Regions:
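Short helix-coil-helix linker/hinge
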Residues: 1-6
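Short helix-to-turn junction characteristic of helix-turn-helix DNA-binding domains
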Residues: 9-16
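Short alpha-helical "recognition helix" segments of helix-turn-helix
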Residues: 17-28
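Short Lys/Arg-enriched helix C-cap and helix-to-coil transition segments
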Residues: 43-59
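Helix-turn-helix/homeodomain-like alpha-helical modules used for DNA recognition
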Residues: 56-130
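Non-catalytic terminal/accessory regions
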Residues: 122-150
């Protein structure tokens, strides 16, 4: 995505109206809406490309939220492909026991990413900053993907 597309997608995702985004950027609502559509098309293609590269079967795609739910038949688990304007595209595999991961550097990076994504998506994480990042991932992704826990 271009920088303008990232900006428009991010501002609209933060809950601002097209008119407010247009005013903030010094442009028109028509420009904002066209840019949003172009951004969502590029984001859809990028999420699908990431899913294909990771051998995932796509179950759900929501470019407005920057998320794709997939399934990896080889390892028999769900996977979530996410997009963040700050961190780009990431692939997350859905494990039943995320607390088993103990690598401190990886867990720190994961926590930063998840907290940033929760902030971008307006997901409340009050009191969640001290829980294991694997559990935090389950909570954040469950907010973004209906029915993920099943």
């Amino acid at each position: 995505m271009s920088e303008k597309q990232k900006t428009v997608w991010s501002l609209l995702g933060a809950g601002l109206s097209a008119a407010t985004v247009a005013s903030k950027l010094g442009s028109t609502r028509q420009f904002v809406n066209q840019t949003k559509l172009a951004a969502e098309a590029k984001l859809s293609a990028s999420l699908l490309d990431a899913a294909q590269a990771n051998h995932l079967q796509t179950r759900m795609l929501d470019p407005k939220k920057g998320i794709l739910l997939g399934y990896h038949p080889g390892v028999k688990c769900k996977a979530v492909v996410t997009y963040s304007t700050k961190f780009g595209i990431k692939v997350w595999y859905w494990y039943d026991n995320p607390e088993a991961v103990t690598d401190k550097e990886f867990l720190g990076q994961t926590r930063r990413y998840l907290l940033e994504m929760a902030k971008e998506r307006r997901i409340k994480v009050i009191g969640m900053k001290s829980i294991h990042p694997g559990k935090l991932a389950q909570l954040v992704f469950s907010e973004l993907v209906p029915g993920l826990k099943e």
